[in-house]
Design a protein with these regions (language model features):
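Face-selective signature of the C-terminal outer-membrane beta-barrel domain
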Residues: 4, 8-26, 53-193, 197-199, ...
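Feature captures outer-membrane beta-barrel proteins of Gram-negative bacteria and organelles
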Residues: 164-170, 200-208, 276-278, 311-317, ...
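Outer-membrane beta-barrel translocator domains and adjoining extracellular loop/strand segments
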Residues: 1, 30-47, 88-97, 143-152, ...
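Outer-membrane beta-barrel signature, preferentially recognizing the C-terminal barrel domain
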Residues: 212, 224-273, 280, 297-309, ...
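Gram-negative outer-membrane beta-barrel transporters
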Residues: 278-285, 295-369
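Outer-membrane beta-barrel "beta-signal"
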Residues: 205-207, 426-458
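Membrane-embedded beta-strand positions of outer-membrane beta-barrel proteins
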Residues: 19-21, 78-80, 133-135, 179-181, ...
């Protein structure tokens, strides 16, 4: 269930107010059965596993946004948000083999209070260029309860992400440039540790318009990312009796650097792009596995530098009633202390408008993906969507779609560590070959007085 309310008000041409209220509640129930083999140096037995899961998550959000435009067309904006979230999970795993039956239960819930405020100033385009500046603060408090432990285990996690910045943009002839510099304050507080980190935050870009509809772009950014609360929470969230998953309350933020290069060429209705990007994650948070009392424990650690690079090409065609695009790229991943691993990524999109109808389809295929301790092999496309829509009247809309038309989507997850290997093949039956039908009726009144939505992304 979901509810959404957007209020907008413009008392005059220079002031804009808006407020958003949103509520969400999702309940999920899953059951699964697995057949496999348990193999050691002395034993080779078949086993079966039955799993059941009941989860619910959701929350409430409220935000306020204000924007003032000065006489010189510069803009001052401010934003405030409060978010309350909850998540409850009850999972049971029963493993049966030749010798015994092993039940495992996970029962926990989480509560979140999150606050965010920001202020930004934009001078607009002036003879001297464009100046922007601002500051933002987001504070998140999470409470997690592990009901499997006796007594109930209570964990508290607090995270702070705040920054201030200033940027300048201008152009000289066909060359456009932008530079931004700032400082970021990040704080992490758990029941086991408390740390504060001051880090630089920066970005820069160059855009050069060449003759014959050619554009060359280069972008750089430096930012920092906090660990997720789930990576900090130090209790088991796995129902596999032989494989525990738990967080690490001593993690520190990751520093992220990215460089992008793009070359665009337009030829009539076609656009061709060649691109490359390079990413470096210092103090990378990655998974690792250790062994304690013959149990494998997956956790997280800050482990050196991760490097990711890709090169690719993109072509698109845009006519009045037909659009299509296709991209192909090759990616390299390198985790600290490991060899470089590569994979291929293909994306396609088609849309055809005819009369009051339009037909569109998307396609995404990837052969593999990697983490520090595992890789996933995809046996068919990750995404294969087709949809036909009919705008019957201005108010009445109907659509029929097949979210996944390429048979039954499946993949194999392979975890390989010293002394431990796990292969897990997953078939997404509920997502495959399940068409849906949508009919919507929209009420319009005084549409000429409609106010634009200027809220920032939440």
């Amino acid at each position: 269930q979901e509810g959404y309310l957007l209020l907008k008000w413009t008392p005059n041409s220079n002031d804009y107010f808006s407020a958003i209220f949103r509520g969400l509640n999702n309940d999920i129930r899953n059951k699964a059965h697995f057949d496999g083999r348990y193999i050691t140096e002395n034993v080779d037995n078949s086993f079966q596993t039955d799993q059941s899961e009941t989860t619910s998550h959701g929350g409430m959000l409220g935000s306020i946004y204000y924007e003032h435009t000065f006489k010189d067309n510069s803009i001052l904006s401010s934003y405030a948000k409060y978010n309350y979230g909850f998540s409850n999970a009850n999972q049971e795993n029963v493993e049966k083999n030749t010798d015994n039956v092993v039940p495992t239960i996970v029962d926990y819930n989480s509560r979140r209070d999150q606050y965010k405020v920001s202020v930004d100033y934009d001078s607009g385009e002036k003879k001297y260029g464009n100046i922007t500046s601002g500051a933002s603060m987001e504070y998140t408090m999470d409470k997690d309860y592990n009901y499997v432990a006796t007594p109930t285990e209570k964990l508290h996690t607090k995270r702070l992400n705040s920054f201030a910045y200033a940027s300048y943009a201008n152009g000289i002839g066909k060359l456009y440039y932008m530079a931004s510099a700032g400082v970021q304050l990040l704080g992490i507080s758990t029941d086991a540790d408390k740390t504060t980190h001051w880090r630089p935050k920066a970005s820069a870009s160059l855009s050069w318009q060449l003759p014959h509809k050619q554009v060359l772009r280069a972008n750089y950014y430096l930012t920092n990312s906090l660990p997720e609360t789930s990576q900090l929470t130090a209790y088991n969230t796995s129902i596999n009796p032989w494989y525990r998953i738990e967080g690490n309350p001593y993690l520190v933020p990751v520093m992220i650097q990215n460089i992008d290069l793009k070359y665009d060429k337009s030829i009539g209705d076609f656009m061709i792009r060649i691109y490359s990007s390079h990413n470096r994650y210092n103090k990378m948070i990655e998974s690792y596995v250790r062994t304690e009392d013959n149990i494998q424990i997956e956790s997280y650690r800050n482990n050196g530098t991760y490097i990711g690079t890709n090169v690719g090409s993109y072509i698109s065609y845009r006519a009045k009633s037909f659009k299509a695009s296709f991209s192909a790229e090759y990616n390299w991943d390198k985790y600290n202390g490991q060899s470089t691993k590569g994979y291929v990524d293909l994306n396609g999109y088609v849309r055809w408008d005819f009369g009051k109808f339009f037909l569109y389809s998307t396609f995404v295929w990837q052969n593999k993906s990697y983490t520090a301790i595992s890789h996933t092999e995809y046996h068919n496309p990750i995404e294969a969507h087709v949809q036909l829509a009919w705008q019957i009247t201005k108010q009445l809309y109907a659509s029929i779609a097949m979210p996944y038309y390429w048979g039954t989507r499946s993949q194999t997850n392979i975890t390989e560590m010293s002394g431990y290997t796990m292969n897990n093949k997953i078939r997404f039956k509920s997502e495959s070959l399940r068409p849906w039908l949508l009919v919507s009726w929209t009420l319009y009144k005084n549409s000429k007085l409609r106010i634009d939505d200027r809220n920032p992304d939440m």
